[in-house]
């Protein structure tokens, strides 16, 4: 495997440059040589030298990164999901700081073309960051849920039952919503969102909140077994508008609760 890696390094290395020997006692030593054996020495610059000495460390970091991206979902692990959210939050300020710093360095050495690219990158990053906050705040106004600030959340399912509001982040707007009741546990999209419920506690409508509007889903069918508190209820889109999912419950009819505006 090492031979293959060294040959690959030879293929992608620059023709002109220092020959860094990977077979010497010191991994950081280099020598000027005309040896043509790519298995012992390879043509390289700083990038290939870095990969040759830090490839294991980078492989471990990338494995962790892939694991976080692949399994950073609530259905797998809430802990990994939290790490993924933290990484995504930190990427915006880190990228913005790097582009600003690079723009400063390029301006100091009078490389104005690269300075322009750096300024453009910083501007785009800042605009995208502001757009994220605007959409998150709009979604939070409708749902009062901190899931609104998850960068991957584009919609939030809101279910009112037993005098409480339950929320579940979604990646998109569903055509229909199915609530499943299993031995008194209310589940949506495969997640348990409430417990200790019976068939009389199922809501007549549920809502899916987006940053710009709220979609109301009305109950159209259900099949329940009262003896075991088990069954399902299906909801379809009925209307959309500037509704709040956190409707007041004092002295309001069901229709007034539904039409309670933000």
Swiss-Prot record:
Residues 19-47, 99-112 are virion surface. Pfam families: CoV_M. Keywords: Glycoprotein, Host Golgi apparatus, Host membrane, Membrane, Transmembrane, Transmembrane helix, Viral envelope protein, Viral matrix protein, Virion. The gene is M. It is found in: Virion membrane; Host Golgi apparatus membrane. This is Membrane protein. Belongs to the alphacoronaviruses M protein family. Homomultimer. Interacts with envelope E protein in the budding compartment of the host cell, which is located between endoplasmic reticulum and the Golgi complex. Forms a complex with HE and S proteins. Interacts with nucleocapsid N protein. This interaction probably participates in RNA packaging into the virus. GO terms for cellular component: host cell Golgi membrane; membrane; viral envelope; virion membrane.
